[in-house]
């Protein structure tokens, strides 16, 4: 009885994988591939053509994870599902269609170089070895247990094309050895990946080929060979023109010249941060001829002493203008402080108060107006038109208000913010919108994933969900506008904490976050109230960690955050509200100001309805997946919960002491 397989494949490696399955006697039930993109230079073999030659059914669905395709694949009842350089992630329901295993062939020695374009990245980074890995597919990309690997050496003269040929041959050898064993045994031993060694690299774009002459010559040489033909090439501006470098060599000397200075034109040799680069081949502009380095020097008029500079770079660089509505709020004031530490930003902010930003108002690149977003619409529209990036941070985000003032929550959080989003559409401005972990509602996933987790809320009579659905609806509106060209990023904070989170006065009327309420009880000597026993778990994130992630989203290196949703939370800092209260108490008792406050009055368990009123409903856990944050902005949180609690407690105790001083 033959072994049945469904194959997802593209590129040369896809052809190699499919041919290896045929050679090993597998029955190919169906093949899924991609239609070639006319904008992409097609230098590789065609899976579709190979299928046609063998009479194999081939498909190119836009979404292979669509229930219709999953159902069809399930009916095929494959023993195995294989993925060979297929460019879309296969979901759990699709992978479950394989009776024995779902396996992927990845072009690196996992766990290193997970992600996109590993052959290019290993060259960029100057590696001397890579390889191919056959591994089990799991929900996370390239993270499943390893079935087989084959190593490939990288020579100093390898380019992306020659290395791809080596990887293609290695893949053929590995599959020739592995596939017959797999068919005979049904399973092969698999070794879990060592997560401590894992690295992830994202998609490369033509813009990544920009040459920075301040870097060492060896680093630039590695970039050039990583993106030379058939890829778009490494390039640099020369005056108003573009020089694409196809081939080069390294000279260890720079003759003492500044980076970017032409040392000679025969050969064309340019000083770098360390050493110099000899350009041996390239072209002028995207449609120019392939020329030698010496002819390029003549084409561009380069002589010894010339500077490889972009005219635009010679002019002063304008700071990025960032509009923050709700600048006095918890995120707004911390974000402003962080961006002002970087001289690349100019902040324009509006809020109805200014107590949290007084420390920033004297800074030359900080501009503040006191105002209400529902009233000062002309000022807002003008500044959206004027600025580059817009962050509408104004919202009611305290749970008691969801049941106490649901219409006000909807009016402010949805209606007023929708106006701002539409101004961003009108003036083609990038919007970075604060979604919320609340949108996941009662999702049952162990870790909430931005792209796959269902957003589940309670019945209409549970009004606490009005905040969640207001935010979710705006997320969906922004996403829809994004399909029509709006530049956006949605970020979802998971229980950020730190100084200036709230005010004790807000806690006194119940309109604050959980930790502020707990601290107020300690300050006033009243029992700490644990709603429904405090068993609910949350993942608490230090505001310093959170703001660093947000700053990277604003920076948006290589446009990686465009059109993305990014959870910003710390899954390692999960604690129940009771545990939060207990740690607060421990640090409170040890604090130098402890003697100024009443004795601890104990914990008291209360029902949620008596605390929040009718219409409240809670969730047991809220744990983020931060894979998107890791791969898109290279972010992982690092501050432990106990440190965050200590900083937050200290801030509020000092606020309480200041209140006492004012009353004297």
Swiss-Prot record:
Its EC number is 2.1.2.13, 1.1.1.305. The active site is at 106 (proton donor), 438 (proton acceptor), 622 (proton donor). The record marks 142 as: Raises pKa of active site His. It catalyses: UDP-alpha-D-glucuronate + NAD(+) = UDP-beta-L-threo-pentopyranos-4-ulose + CO2 + NADH; UDP-4-amino-4-deoxy-beta-L-arabinose + (6R)-10-formyltetrahydrofolate = UDP-4-deoxy-4-formamido-beta-L-arabinose + (6S)-5,6,7,8-tetrahydrofolate + H(+). Residues 1-308 are annotated as: Formyltransferase ArnAFT. GO terms for molecular function: carboxy-lyase activity; UDP-4-amino-4-deoxy-L-arabinose formyltransferase activity; UDP-glucuronate dehydrogenase activity. It holds the Pfam family Epimerase. Bifunctional enzyme that catalyzes the oxidative decarboxylation of UDP-glucuronic acid (UDP-GlcUA) to UDP-4-keto-arabinose (UDP-Ara4O) and the addition of a formyl group to UDP-4-amino-4-deoxy-L-arabinose (UDP-L-Ara4N) to form UDP-L-4-formamido-arabinose (UDP-L-Ara4FN). The modified arabinose is attached to lipid A and is required for resistance to polymyxin and cationic antimicrobial peptides. Homohexamer, formed by a dimer of trimers. In the N-terminal section; belongs to the Fmt family. UDP-L-Ara4N formyltransferase subfamily. In the C-terminal section; belongs to the NAD(P)-dependent epimerase/dehydratase family. UDP-glucuronic acid decarboxylase subfamily. This is Bifunctional polymyxin resistance protein ArnA. The gene is arnA.
């Amino acid at each position: 009885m033959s072994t049945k397989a469904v194959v997802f494949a593209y590129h040369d490696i896809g052809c190699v994988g499919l041919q290896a399955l045929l050679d090993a006697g597998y029955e190919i039930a169906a093949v899924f591939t991609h239609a070639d993109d006319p904008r992409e230079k097609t230098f590789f073999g065609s899976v579709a053509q190979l299928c046609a030659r063998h009479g194999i059914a081939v498909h190119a669905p836009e979404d292979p994870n669509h229930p219709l395709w999953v159902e069809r694949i399930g009916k095929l009842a494959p023993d195995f599902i294989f993925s060979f350089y297929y460019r879309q992630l296969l979901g759990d329901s699709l992978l479950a269609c394989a009776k024995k295993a779902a396996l992927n062939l990845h072009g690196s020695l996992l766990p290193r170089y997970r992600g996109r374009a590993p052959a290019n990245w290993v060259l960029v980074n100057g590696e001397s070895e890579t390889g191919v890995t056959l591994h089990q597919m799991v929900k996370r990309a390239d993270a499943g247990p390893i079935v087989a690997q084959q190593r490939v050496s990288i020579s100093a003269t390898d380019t992306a094309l020659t290395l791809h040929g080596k990887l293609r041959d290695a893949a053929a050898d590995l599959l020739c050895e592995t596939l017959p064993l797999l068919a005979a045994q049904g399973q092969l031993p698999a070794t879990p990946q060592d997560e401590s060694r894992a690295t992830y690299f994202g998609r490369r774009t033509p813009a990544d080929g920009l040459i920075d002459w301040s870097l060492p010559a060896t680093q630039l040489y590695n970039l050039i060979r990583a993106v030379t033909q058939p890829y778009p090439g490494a390039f640099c501006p020369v005056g108003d023109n573009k020089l694409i470098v196809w081939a080069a060599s390294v000279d260890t000397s720079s003759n003492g010249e500044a980076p970017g200075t032409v040392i000679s034109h025969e050969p064309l040799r340019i000083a770098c941060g360390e050493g110099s680069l000899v350009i041996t081949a390239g072209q002028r502009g995207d449609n120019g001829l392939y020329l030698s380095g010496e002819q390029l020097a003549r084409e561009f008029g380069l002589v010894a002493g010339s500077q490889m500079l972009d005219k635009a770079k010679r002019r002063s660089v304008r700071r990025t203008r960032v509009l923050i509505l709700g600048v006095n709020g918890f995120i707004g004031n911390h974000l402003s402080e962080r961006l002002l530490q970087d001289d690349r930003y100019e902040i324009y902010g509006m809020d109805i108060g200014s107590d949290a930003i007084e420390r920033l108002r004297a800074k030359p690149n900080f501009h503040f107006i006191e105002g209400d977003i529902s009233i000062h619409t002309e000022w807002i529209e003008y500044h959206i038109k004027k600025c580059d990036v817009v962050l509408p941070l104004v919202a009611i985000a305290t749970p008691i208000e969801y049941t106490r003032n649901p219409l006000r929550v909807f009016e402010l959080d949805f209606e007023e913010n929708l106006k701002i989003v539409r101004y961003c559409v009108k003036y083609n401005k990038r919007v970075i919108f604060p979604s919320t972990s609340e949108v996941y509602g009662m999702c049952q996933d162990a870790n909430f994933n931005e792209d796959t987790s269902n957003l589940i809320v309670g019945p209409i009579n549970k009004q606490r969900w009005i905040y969640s659905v207001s935010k979710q609806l705006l997320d969906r509106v922004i996403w829809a506008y994004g399909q029509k060209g709006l530049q956006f990023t949605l970020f979802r904070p998971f229980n950020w904490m730190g100084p200036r989170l709230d005010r004790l006065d807000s806690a006194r009327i119940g309109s604050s976050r959980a930790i502020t309420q707990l601290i107020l009880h300690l300050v006033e000597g009243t029992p700490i109230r644990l709603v429904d026993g405090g068993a609910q778990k949350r993942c608490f994130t230090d505001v310093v960690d959170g703001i660093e992630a947000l700053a990277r989203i604003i920076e948006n290196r290589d446009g990686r955050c465009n059109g993305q949703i990014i959870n910003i939370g710390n899954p390692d800092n999960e604690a129940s509200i009771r545990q939060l209260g207990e740690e607060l108490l421990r640090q409170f008792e040890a604090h130098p100001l402890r003697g100024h406050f009443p004795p601890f009055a104990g914990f008291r368990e209360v029902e949620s309805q008596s605390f929040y009123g009718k219409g409240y409903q809670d969730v047991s856990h809220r744990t983020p997946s931060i894979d998107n944050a890791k791969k898109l902005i290279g972010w992982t949180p690092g501050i432990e919960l106990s440190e965050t609690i200590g900083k937050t407690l200290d801030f509020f105790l000092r606020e309480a002491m200041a209140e006492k001083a004012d009353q004297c």
